[in-house]
């Protein structure tokens, strides 16, 4: 019985040592990858932040170009309206009234 108990103790000790060394190796590899900047979540977050900044940068450019195109079209359409609309009634409707505001006079 003494031999069986010592074999069981040896197997248990070997198993504990193997598990402990595997855990130590995992911790060491993770710490070295964190220092090298290759840790999975760090790289993923960095890529996401770069992607966000590029998206906002490109989106801002698109908004600016769309607005400039809109202004060009608006200018052209207003010139075209001035040329085609020769009626005085249309101009009177578009004119801004000057003087005191009639809503304030009660």
UniProtKB/Swiss-Prot annotation:
GO terms for cellular component: apoplast. Glycans are attached at residues 47, 100. One of its GO terms (biological process) is maintenance of root meristem identity. Residues 72-82 have a biased composition (Basic residues). Keywords: Developmental protein, Differentiation, Glycoprotein, Hydroxylation, Secreted, Signal. Residues 72-106 are annotated as: Disordered. InterPro entries: CLE_plant (IPR033249). Residues 1-31 form the signal peptide. The modification Hydroxyproline is found at residues 97, 100. Belongs to the CLV3/ESR signal peptide family. PANTHER family: CLAVATA3/ESR (CLE)-RELATED PROTEIN 22, CLAVATA3_ESR (CLE)-RELATED PROTEIN 21. This is CLAVATA3/ESR (CLE)-related protein 21. The lineage of its organism: Eukaryota, Viridiplantae, Streptophyta, Embryophyta, Tracheophyta. The gene is CLE21.
């Amino acid at each position: 019985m003494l031999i069986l108990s010592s074999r069981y103790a040896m197997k248990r000790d070997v198993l504990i040592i193997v598990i402990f060394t595997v855990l130590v190796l995992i911790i060491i590899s993770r710490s070295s990858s964190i220092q090298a900047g290759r840790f999975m979540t760090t790289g993923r977050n960095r890529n996401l932040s770069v992607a966000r900044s590029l998206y906002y940068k490109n989106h801002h450019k698109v908004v600016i170009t769309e607005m400039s195109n809109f202004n060009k079209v608006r200018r052209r359409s207003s010139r075209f309206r001035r040329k085609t609309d020769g009626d005085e009634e249309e101009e009177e409707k578009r004119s801004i009234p000057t003087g005191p505001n009639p809503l304030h006079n009660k």
